[in-house]
Amino acid sequence: LVPFVEKILAIEIKTEPYFKEAKKKYVTDKNINQPFLDEIKSEFKDDQYTFEDNERLLHSHGQNGPDEVFKVLYNKLQKFADLVIYIESDEDTEKLINLAIKHDVCLVPFGGGTNVTNALKLPKQESRMIVSVDTRRLDKIESMDKKNLLVTVQAGITGKSLEEQLQK
């Protein structure tokens, strides 16, 4: 199609991308609130939190439009979660919220990662430690009312998982 348009319009269309995709994605240095981290380590299992760069990157953007995808592909994100926590229960949630209040830490919810709520647009002026709260391990059906066709589910359940559990 490009050669046809070039010939008809007598112009040359440059097909080289304006930006080159970044081969290695970078994340900023972590902003650590040490007293908060010490309590996290004592209250949560080791597999419930991570500082790993790829997880921090994944939990610092959504897929809510080309703007977010562009920023990831071309290293244009300016703010990243400092820590990712995977909550597994209501008790975990309550503990985490209380610790965040106590230590003045910013919590950001992470569901499926699409960012339809824009919660993952982390404000670049935020100076506190930012913790991404991943709810995907909260993936159970809490209750079912077959008569009224109502289901109460945990925050991290996906449509596919819900369908599978309802089939049982």
Segments and roles (model prediction):
Residues 1-168:
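Noncatalytic alpha-helical scaffold of FAD-dependent oxidoreductases
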